[in-house]
Amino acid sequence: IKPTNMRGVESAGMLCSGKELGLTEADYPGAEFNGIMILHEEHPLGQRIQDAVGMNDIIFDIELTPNRADCQSIIGICREAAAALGQKFREPVIRPVTGEGDASDYASVSVENTELCPRYSARVVTDLVIEPSPKWMQRRLRAVGMRPINNIVDITNYVLVEYGHPMHAFDLACVAQGHIIVRNARENETVVTLDGKERAVTPEMLLIADPEKGVGIAGVMGGENSEITAATKATLFEAAAFKGSNIRATTRKLRHVTDAAARFIKGVEPVNAYLALARAIELVDDLHAGKVIGEPIDVCAADVSPRVIDVDYAHVNKILNTDITPEDMVKMLATINIPSEVCGDKLRVDVPHYRTDIESGIEADWDIAEEVGRIYGYDNIPPTLMRGNTFRGRIGDDLKDEDAMKDLLVAQGCCEMYNLSLIHISE
């Protein structure tokens, strides 16, 4: 902005609206108001607008490969950054919070479909104090494009960003009998979600319900009939693991993808559900947002025992065209928090619970080769030409029959139509 002469008076500044500054409601409350933007606090003249609205942080825009669901979180990125910088990653220690009373006096959980919901963990908090979350939490949420709402909802979103595990908070008074039922939707059932839209659900979809009604679409969005409001006095925090393929099918039918659904689709570990819940309760206690009741309610049908795989390190070297000693492989894997040891002609690898991309069985050698290769450095691997036999292609009998049928129908006067495969069937 340069000094400008307006009506004979030199003006050295300008009063701007949030829109003129390129701000949205997620960046600063009231930024989308049609008029001059009003700051809610006193700020010294000459202060940078970035500092005044809390947008002075450094934001990293990171492109992830689809298989690394664990990196959709601050902690996941920190693990990778520590490995890249040669630093030891310090795993966050969650302070356990012991609640008073018995949670079963307030709530209960039953899971009817454990295949689609292998784990459902919940925690009751009463005597809620609903208020804006602290400035530091609001600032961090805005930095990642989330709009602060209140302390309880913000805690669930903060844990989502920090641990990469979606959470939800129900108004416990709106859950009939305090009983949560994880079940498939019924015929002709509808749910009004938090965005105010009535959505028709089908029996293939998983629903969070109480004995009377649906209170949320599992892994996608909570229901409007149980949302946290200023009048909420007790809440049930939910941290669950839902089957990614089912959530993907649900979002396609509903034509609606949320941040939570995107993470479930890529895969979340049942172990992480319990950690996320513990972190949320720790924040509730730190912010004095309510009274924690009893112990967690945990319905777990998943195998959460540590996963151990045996890897043929000679095969790893063959895949990479390298000659790395097994002892060096152990050291390389340790830099990315994957413990391992040499056992004869194998590497015995303890797979961290968050590394859902590392498979067991015949894929294990290839997955560990990928990890060893990126730590060793692909530039250090000697280039070689691809070797292999080529075969003459041929059209299969099924395709021949299909082409013959098409030719016959066209000869009879029919027209062949090619539809776009990426549009909804109704269009």
List where the protein language model places each region.
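RNA/tRNA-interacting regions in translation and RNA-turnover enzymes
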Residues: 1-399, 403-410
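Structured aminoacyl-transfer and RNA-binding surfaces used for tRNA recognition/handling
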Residues: 148, 416-421
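Residue-level detector of conserved catalytic or cofactor/ligand-binding positions
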Residues: 421-427
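Glycine-rich anion/phosphate-binding loop at the beta-strand->alpha-helix junction
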Residues: 187, 415-416
